[in-house]
Amino acid sequence: MKRFVIGILAHVDAGKTTMSEAILYETGKLKKMGRVDNRDAFLDTFALERARGITIFSKQAVFPLGDTFVTLLDTPGHVDFSAEMERTLQVLDYAVLIVSGADGVQGHTETLWRLLRRYRIPVFIFVNKMDQKGTDRDAVLASLKERLDHGVVDFSGVIGNEDVLTFSASAEPFAAVCRDPEEAAEEIATCDEVLLEAYLADGTLKTDDVRKVIHDRKLFPCFFGSALKLSGVREFLTALGEFATCPDYTKDFGA
């Protein structure tokens, strides 16, 4: 049975717990999404968390993703509980960094990024709250590249369910409109020298090679949407299932 562990991280009020709820709902683990402001979020189990509307303790849930079981860890977003968040990083295979499309990259976002770099954790990025007025998708993406890493790439419409990467127009309302497949492929290829050489040789990107570049923290897939409205969540989950790799544990691995 294949398994891997993801952690949901964010600056405060980016919608981290709402994203966790959306993931569990979309994968059939919840019949109804809870809301932080309604004090009925599934993963906010302590009375103090529900009263204050913040996550204080890391929580765990397991959901199916194709033929893989994914363990999700919802971590505190408030800077006062950073020690609790950092404690979970040591067990993660991948991190999902939530950024508010309304607020953009915050100081705490950069702190989280430095911690993820220190622990060498591969990262998927979800830009949330894109349904709010005044959000600028291109500006947020440019800020992510400038303040976090130039390897942050918009993965709207990128498909990895075949041996070779393919591209299609995304149906998500906050995805890029009419992206040029060749331009998208080149942006991915330039994140790694070996990947670029292979792409220049035959004009294709092998999906396994892209998975490796993501795992090696040279490429950071980025998605846009609204967790509260379930926009972009399904596309993100599909990509997570296609591009995340399960760790190889030996038979004698255990606590």
Residue ranges of predicted features:
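Structural and coupling elements of P-loop NTPases
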Residues: 1-255
